[in-house]
């Protein structure tokens, strides 16, 4: 398998930039009253379906809520939100973005982001149980790094752990058939058979791959750690806990390959390689100079 297959992989993340006009951060003490009010107004369970770092950090850039709704029911949900007076603004992309008023807003609580009295609340369609696992974010003090670091490391582990590649390869170095795990934002952890897609003219292969699910899905943290050969569900909490778990459970060669692929991932390169991996790379470079 080419390293580029893993290092160029992008992972879905929760966006905290606030795409709606006039929204700002929300303090942890304001989240529950805001959701309590909206639950009564909308007749929906919101508090049990929040995702990411909401309620784990002092301030959140927005509120993300999983909604178990079928695609054909989305127009009805949109209409319901549009006519509700507590939904001040609404827009749809891959999620439903809304602007809502913060209940019991305390202007004295400030942070390095704007505090406007309004917050963006995103409704994200999907299986709430799985989305809580996929979009898990560590609490304050639990990790130096955001949940995206954990998710990318977990995706790399899935791509390399118990991977089976055929000896035959394409001209650009891909195996003609691979079996691997895939950490999917919509399907859960699944086992797939991957084949490069042939060109229509029959001359070689395109850059695309075709994945066929052959086992799974595994949706709960307990199931995932069992399938991936780890110890306990807490291993999935953060980048640090996941890195420690593979160092304790995987052969040194596989661990090194996973961490090298993670450090070379394009997203990780863009947001910054964790300092512990930078130190390891500096030591390796020094040792190479001595040889």
Language-model segment annotations:
Residues 1-2, 81:
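Short acidic, low-complexity intrinsically disordered linear motifs used
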Residues 2-51:
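Helical scaffold of the NTase/Pol beta-like nucleotidyltransferase catalytic core
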Residues 37-41, 69, 81, 90-95, ...:
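Intrinsically disordered, low-complexity eukaryotic regions enriched in glycine, serine
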Residues 46-47, 85, 166-169:
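Short, surface-exposed acidic
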Residues 73-84:
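Short amphipathic alpha-helices in soluble, non-transmembrane regions
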Residues 82-131:
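Conserved catalytic core of two-metal-ion nucleotidyltransferases
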